[in-house]
């Protein structure tokens, strides 16, 4: 039985690291088909989710009350999952340079709780090269595991438009990628199970990262023209 089949059968779990306006809708979408561990460092936010309150207002209280996501602020629960999705923020420093502290912190937490054979997929908006040159080395160092041997990686940029109740995560085409061709196909297969709008498998992680940068740039240019 493949890992994909094990995820669908409930034998293996998926984790979502970062339950904000990006992570929460993804967690809820996957929880309809796969057992999901939803992790966030903010214990107060976790308690709100457990009580049926959606502080992000992205999916609504009714959906939160019904979802089967296993909400937790305990990082050791990540050991239960084999497929991890990182959806933490990527803010900007005062000098307008990217602040990679959140993604590096998430990488460190995953490294401390990574089991052999796991796949780590980043969704956070980053410039080309961050996944493989910044995040993966942290996971590798902390876990003591070898990249593309003991664990694998992918990148699938978040494309959610916050507050848009019509174009939800399932209805926005997803770009996917993997650290090897085989892992890329697997990551694409996992996302295809919930993204009804379809997916596009990029040839490499860096290409997927660049696609997000280009999309954001195009959006800024279009807004500038309208203004």
Please report, for each region that a protein language model flagged, where it lies by residue.
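Structural/interface elements that position substrates and couple domains in central-metabolism enzymes
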Residues: 1-227
């Amino acid at each position: 039985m493949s890992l994909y089949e094990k995820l669908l059968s409930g034998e293996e779990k998926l984790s979502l690291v970062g339950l904000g306006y990006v992570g929460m809708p993804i967690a809820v979408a996957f929880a309809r088909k796969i057992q999901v561990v939803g992790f966030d460092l903010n214990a107060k936010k976790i308690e709100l989710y457990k009580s049926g309150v959606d502080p992000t207002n992205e999916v609504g209280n009714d959906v939160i009350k019904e979802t089967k996501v296993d909400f937790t602020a305990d990082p050791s629960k990540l050991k239960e999952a084999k497929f991890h999705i990182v959806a933490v923020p990527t803010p900007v420093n005062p000098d307008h340079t990217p602040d990679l502290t959140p993604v590096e912190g998430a990488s460190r937490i995953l490294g401390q709780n990574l089991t052999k054979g796991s796949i780590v997929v980043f969704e956070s908006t980053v410039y080309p090269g961050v996944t493989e040159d910044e995040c993966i080395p942290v996971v590798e160092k902390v876990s003591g595991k070898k990249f593309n041997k003991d664990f694998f990686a992918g990148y699938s940029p978040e494309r959610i438009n916050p507050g848009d109740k019509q174009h939800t995560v399932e209805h926005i085409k997803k770009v996917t990628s993997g650290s090897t061709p085989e892992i890329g196909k697997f990551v694409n297969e996992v996302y295809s199970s919930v993204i009804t709008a379809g997916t596009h498998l990029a040839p490499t992680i860096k290409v997927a990262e660049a696609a997000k940068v280009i999309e954001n740039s195009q959006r800024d240019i279009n807004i500038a023209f309208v203004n």
